[in-house]
Amino acid sequence: MAEHIIVTLDGPAGVGKTTLARNIAEELGIAYMDTGAMFRSIGWKLGNVVESVPPAEIEKKLAGFRFSLSGAGAATQLSLNGTPVGDEIRTEEVALLASAVATLPVVRTFLKKTQQKLGSEVSLVAEGRDMGTVIFPAARYKFFLDATPEERARRRYEQLTAAGETPDLKALTDQIRKRDHQDRSRVVAPLRPADDAIIIDTTELDVQGVFAAIMSKLK
């Protein structure tokens, strides 16, 4: 795609943003930016001491972090300081750490600058919580995906079960509700759709249905 383009996909955990963003980026032949993975990476690196560490100390640590993107579509690779980000960040514990660091202004400021820089360099599909409201408010195409907590927990349950784990559905539902509360009630960049975003409820839709709905708006 010769034209520089940014597509934003926002929404809570478990609505299928990651799969859809990859598929859309693949279809358009542009990069995919997993901003949730960026927050997870920072949470994983900083650990659960974020609440007890002064912002100035966290800022010093962040100064040593460098995110980069390579490739396009489903093959897009996010790296931190030259090392590819892998499955080590895809645990429920790291997810809660990510939500915790997302409340810190120093972290959000750092990632905002990082993400906007990446977006100025390449066309991309950006998925996260505030892509259309804070990071890329001027993006031409903005989407907000949602689904009930129960449906999102069910999807996560199936993912973990397929991976050979033995998750607890009630615990997953409780974790999702907790993350929803953290994400929607935080003072800094709370989870909400942009005023000009197209809102899609994915509760009763499969990935192909949501993909088709989004692509129809991009053509």
Curated annotation (Swiss-Prot):
Check the record and name the Gene3D superfamilies matching this protein: P-loop containing nucleotide triphosphate hydrolases
Q: Name the keywords, alphabetized.
A: ATP-binding, Cytoplasm, Kinase, Nucleotide-binding, Transferase
UniProt-annotated binding residues for ATP: G11, P12, A13, G14, V15, G16, K17, T18, T19
Q: What is its main location?
A: cytoplasm
In the record, biological process GO terms are: pyrimidine nucleotide metabolic process
- Family per UniProt? Belongs to the cytidylate kinase family. Type 1 subfamily.
Protein name, UniProt field: Cytidylate kinase
Instruction: State the species of origin.
Output: Oleidesulfovibrio alaskensis (strain ATCC BAA-1058 / DSM 17464 / G20) (Desulfovibrio alaskensis)
Which lineage ranks, top first, belong to the organism behind this chain? Bacteria, Pseudomonadati, Thermodesulfobacteriota, Desulfovibrionia, Desulfovibrionales
Q: Which gene encodes it?
A: cmk
